[in-house]
Regions:
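Solvent-exposed alpha-helices and their adjacent loops that cap or buttress functional pockets
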Residues: 96, 104-110, 133, 164-168, ...
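A glycine-rich helix N-cap at a beta->alpha junction
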Residues: 160-174
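C-terminal core of ALDH-fold dehydrogenases
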Residues: 319, 324-409
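ALDH superfamily catalytic-core signature
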Residues: 6, 39, 120-123, 127-138, ...
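N-terminal Rossmann-like NAD(P)+-binding subdomain of aldehyde/semialdehyde dehydrogenases
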Residues: 1-103
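Substrate-binding/gating loop at the entrance of the active-site cleft, primarily
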Residues: 95-139, 144-154
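Aldehyde/semialdehyde dehydrogenase
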Residues: 67-68, 77, 179-198, 203-207, ...
Length: 410
């Protein structure tokens, strides 16, 4: 059944109405709701996989839909882990005294209603709820048609669990209309939404930029690079590249492009191709002269997030060319250098414009859980108000609290 514009607005009003209660909920209340929700995460995924296979969704995109026993356990475990994390609400981030006797402090407070519009992965329903609740925010969610059945079941389970602990069920509000018109209306609920976070591909991001009238944080493309420097330990480089590309190719922190210094390209590329058997390599002319099995890369390939077992290759003469290429073709997500030259590592870290830069480590580590944040709401590729993995602190804002004893301004 299609949900009308007025109904979407009603959902927004419900989310807004629940926000004040969540903003002042105690840590114990929030943790109890998280633990209860973890116990209620059950089923509803089989239909989505069947539909996906019928509609011809690729295997790697089906991986985003899959919620087998281990992933369901992972969702429940993620909620419990968030319950164990420090509550950011009420944290004093700075405090000072003025000569006139005023005491000024900055205190973390919830954003209010955090809207998330996302594609494919139904586990986002659980992850987003957990982080929003622990940070005192309402989770206002709109998923994709492919995962609708799972999202409904997960949301219903969570809402029932939350209500059973005394907090409002509307701590999670799910929009079930998956039409484009509903998505645009969702992006424009200025009276209800404090922050919108998209979790999806380029078309979703373009839609947000073109249509959203609410504040948003872009969880953008992950066109991530691995640069193998002239001084690199080549065994280490192969291991890092293999992990970055093949561990989970459908996620945003997977490597999509390989950049190799010319001094080591002759030795490295044949070894890399052999190690990454099953991965399609497309490259520039220099890389194909070294390894003829590398396919011809179109210009767009160097700026493409493949989300599959495919990678582009470019050979460069020096670090300057590597940095220039990464900054030009990259998406500002995560970029890695493999090197034993500390000066090269420092230059790469300073000059590459990305949310995360890694030295001698896989791009797959750019993740809230790996960073110690617990589950993440996304990885921001913009610079305001958050950048990189967004955990609990990034779902708050700061309020100034000023205490005096009768001071007035002269």
């Amino acid at each position: 059944m299609s949900v009308t514009t007025s109904t979407i607005a009603d959902l927004g009003r419900r989310a807004r109405a629940a926000a004040p209660t969540l903003a002042v909920a105690s840590t114990d209340q929030k943790n109890a709701a998280l633990d209860a929700a973890a116990d209620r995460i059950l089923e509803g995924n089989e239909l989505d996989l069947v539909r996906g296979e019928i509609e011809g969704i690729s295997a790697n995109l089906l991986d985003r839909l899959r919620l087998d026993g281990s992933r369901l356990e992972g969702m429940a475990s993620g909620l419990r882990q968030v319950a164990e994390l420090p509550d950011p609400v009420g944290e004093v981030t700075a405090a000072w005294d003025r000569p006139n006797g005023l005491h000024i402090s900055k205190v973390r407070v919830p954003l209010g209603v955090v809207a998330i519009i996302y594609e494919m992965r139904p586990n986002v329903t659980s992850d987003a709820f957990g982080l929003c609740l622990k940070s005192g925010n309402v989770a206002f969610l709109r998923g994709s048609s492919a995962a609708l059945d799972s999202n409904r079941v997960i949301a219903a389970s969570i809402r029932a669990a939350v209500a059973g602990t005394g907090l409002p069920a509307d701590a999670l509000v799910l929009v079930e209309d998956v039409s484009r018109e509903a998505a645009v209306e969702f992006m424009q609920l200025r009276e209800s939404i404090d922050c919108l976070i998209p979790r999806g591909g380029p078309s979703l991001i373009r839609s947000i930029v073109d249509n959203a009238t609410v504040p948003y944080v872009i969880d953008g493309d992950g066109n991530c690079h691995v640069y193998v420097d002239a001084s690199a330990d080549l065994d280490m480089a192969v291991s890092i590249l293999h992990n970055a590309k093949t561990h989970r190719p459908s996620v945003c922190n997977a490597a999509e492009s390989l950049v190799v210094h010319a001094d080591v390209a002759d030795e490295f590329l044949p070894v890399a191709l052999a190690a990454l058997d099953g991965v399609e390599f497309v490259g520039d002319g220099r890389s194909r002269l070294i390894a003829p099995s590398i396919g011809v890369a179109e210009d767009d390939d160097f700026a493409t997030e493949f989300l599959d077992l495919k990678i582009s290759v470019r050979v460069v003469n020096n670090l300057d060319e590597a940095i220039e290429h990464v900054n030009q073709a990259g998406s500002g997500h995560s970029e890695a250098i493999v090197t034993s030259d500390e000066a090269a590592a420092q230059r790469f870290c300073k000059e590459v414009d990305a949310a995360a830069v890694l030295v001698n480590a896989s791009t797959r580590f750019v993740d809230g859980e790996e960073f110690g944040f617990g589950a993440e709401i996304g990885i921001s590729t913009q610079k305001l108000h958050a950048r990189g993995p967004m955990g609990l602190p990034q779902l708050t804002t700061e309020k100034y609290v000023v205490r005096g004893d009768g001071q007035v301004r002269a």
